[in-house]
Amino acid sequence: MTQKLHIKTWGCQMNEYDSAKIADLLLSTHGLELTEEAEQADVLLLNTCSIREKAQEKVFSQLGRWKTWKNEKPGLIIGVGGCVASQEGEHIRERAPFVDIIFGPQTLHRLPEMINQIRGGKSSVVDVSFPEIEKFDCLPEPKAEGPTAFVSIMEGCNKYCTYCVVPYTRGEEVSRPLDDVLFEVAQLADQGVREINLLGQNVNAYRGPTHDGGICTFAELLRLVASIDGIDRLRFTTSHPIEFTDDIIDVYADTPELVSFLHLPVQSGADRILTMMKRGHTALEYKSIIRKLRKVRPDIQISSDFIVGFPGETNEEFEQTMNLIADVNFDMSFSFVYSARPGTPAADMPDDVSEEEKKQRLYLLQQRINNQAAKFSRAMLGTEQRVLVEGPSKKDIMELTGRTENNRIVNFKGTPDMIGKFVDIQITDVFTNSLRGDVIRTEDEMGLRVEQSPQSVIRRTRKEDELGVGKYVA
């Protein structure tokens, strides 16, 4: 009887990417088939996030629900991974001794051996070490699931913002070798992927070693990925302003595959708060980056992250953030009230903004950005938008749905052969959470750039053993 795997994932896109890799890995090594029904699983994994408030308690609450199944099914294996696992380590076992495996973001590739050890009679396995980039060498080939895909190009962060736990839970910055990244992208392109989203905690700090001993910058990587045939839309997340160099802006000027949409976290519009956060830039320097971008891409839309109620934030400083939001004209945001993360420098600062004040500021901030986003959507009425078709519409299976460069959902009448391809749509209606339109051009009429085939990239970047035989991680 086929055994089942259930993974519950919290947090960022990096965690989503890691969970997908875990599922592929354990299917190839142990034949574990992924299930959405946790009760059916033989292996239960919790991939955690430590960014949000009370992250640890959320983990133990979930584990408490799983404990009853462990009592009923003694052979059930329970594992905890992700950033909370990295942060808490053995403490998880102290509070929840029924947990079999504790693994960090950098040791997920060792899960097959950990499972073997538990099945071999070992009571528990804990490995939350930081073996740099080793995990990418031990994961199976990527499998495309639709026309879009994420590709992790680096891990960790060296910025040590005072409120953030990432450097402590995912380690410092380590970039994947250039050929490894291109090989994965080419494999996905060969399977029909049309949009790639490059991932990293500080993605634009990428400095990947090349086969000849050099270093590939993030700007160079963007151009190389965009040159692979079939990859006609390119995104990246999450970037840091102090790494957003002019050579990256130059890519926006000459690489049409790079979308006119950027997520660039700023956190606050007040310089004193930015200094206390150890962000390394001022509000004016942030706006300077946006001005340069809009000079080469006048239509680019910007989203950001904001923390309101950081220790010591005054009403005047919050207004500076609101002014920045208006000046930049952000399209959307991920915004949160400040809550201290244990072990970070900011946790030692007096948290002197009341919860009521934090919530009020958050409401005002989100209301302003929502209003700005609505104006952007209304301005799209009557315009022509390029849409990547993802599949049937959730609202009407007789229609198709896709996304624009600026992440708007568009529903329209089309044919099944359009799925996984681009179409140009004339926007005819604007709704709160979606747009409607009519097809005016199919992909065959677009003349998309053709430069190098995925197969040629695969041949050039595949790894070989000492006999010159190609090696593929299976």
UniProtKB/Swiss-Prot annotation:
Cofactor stoichiometry and binding remark: Binds 2 [4Fe-4S] clusters. One cluster is coordinated with 3 cysteines and an exchangeable S-adenosyl-L-methionine.
Domain MTTase N-terminal: residue ranges: 3-120
GO cellular component terms, semicolon-separated: cytosol
Domain of life where this protein originates: Bacteria
TM helices/strands, residue ranges: none
Binding site for [4Fe-4S] cluster 1: 12, 49, 83
Listed InterPro entries: Elp3/MiaA/NifB-like_rSAM (IPR006638), Methylthiotransferase (IPR005839), Methylthiotransferase_CS (IPR020612), Methylthiotransferase_N (IPR013848), Methylthiotransferase_N_sf (IPR038135), MiaB_methiolase (IPR006463), rSAM (IPR007197), rSAM_horseshoe (IPR023404)
Required cofactor(s): [4Fe-4S] cluster
EC numbers for this chain: 2.8.4.3
Domain TRAM: 378-441
Residues involved in [4Fe-4S] cluster 2 binding: 157, 161, 164
UniProt catalytic activity: N(6)-dimethylallyladenosine(37) in tRNA + (sulfur carrier)-SH + AH2 + 2 S-adenosyl-L-methionine = 2-methylsulfanyl-N(6)-dimethylallyladenosine(37) in tRNA + (sulfur carrier)-H + 5'-deoxyadenosine + L-methionine + A + S-adenosyl-L-homocysteine + 2 H(+)
Enzymatic class: transferase
All residue ranges annotated as the Radical SAM core domain in the record: 143-375
Predominant place of localization: cytoplasm
Localization in the cell: Cytoplasm
SMART domains: Elp3
Molecular function, one GO term: 4 iron, 4 sulfur cluster binding
Role summary: Catalyzes the methylthiolation of N6-(dimethylallyl)adenosine (i(6)A), leading to the formation of 2-methylthio-N6-(dimethylallyl)adenosine (ms(2)i(6)A) at position 37 in tRNAs that read codons beginning with uridine.
Record-linked HAMAP family: tRNA_metthiotr_MiaB (MF_01864)
Quaternary data: Monomer.
Family statement: Belongs to the methylthiotransferase family. MiaB subfamily.
Name of the protein in question: tRNA-2-methylthio-N(6)-dimethylallyladenosine synthase
Upper taxonomic lineage: Bacteria, Pseudomonadati, Pseudomonadota, Gammaproteobacteria, Pasteurellales
